[in-house]
Amino acid sequence: MYEIKNSKQVELSDRVRFRCVRCAACCRNVEGAVVIEPKDGYYLAKHLGISVSTFYEKYTRMFLLEDVEFPIFTLKVTGKDKACIFLNGKRCSVQDAKPRTCKMYPFWVCPDDKGGFLYNFSTEQRHHPKGSIVKVKDWMRDNLSEEDKEFFGEETRAMSEIAPLYNILHKCLKDNTTLIEKIIFFKYFLYETDEPFMSQFKRNNRVLKDELERIINKYTDIYGG
């Protein structure tokens, strides 16, 4: 999950100064910065009226994390200023479905190891006007939905099972192309936008785990464990 550089941890009870003047500066020079999580891809595809796989193919770039080669997607950028592909002048053309990274800015949130959340405030941009005081808890209430929280919980739970299996296969297989394709298909692509997201996300995680276990068992049968 994307973490904003140059940030400081804050508590829900804290207050910070921030005011958005819709200058769109935070939408420029964002190459590789706006990570698209499965939930983001689903809602953006639904908003645009296209399939989820078409959204990823048309509007994102895939990167493989160093060492483990786990696939992640980020929004494409355009122009010399490497602006978000959805920036139209100074306005977001997908405002109602914009990614969580954008919705939460200048904050970012991640799960802690106790089932709660860590909250951070970006200090990286000097163009932020020193506006009125913002209560952290109010910002989270308005921008961090219950489905976001449920997604965090399921993602953390699922990856605790999937990551060890993926790491085993990544080390054993000579060619990881098929492995990476399975991650992309089940984790990112396999959604119907006329069905609820979370039930599909949970199903896909279960199926992906079973599929990785099947490959491990097949590999063990062939080469020995």
Regions found by a protein language model. Name each.
Residues 1-225:
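Short loop/turn segments that flank or connect secondary-structure elements
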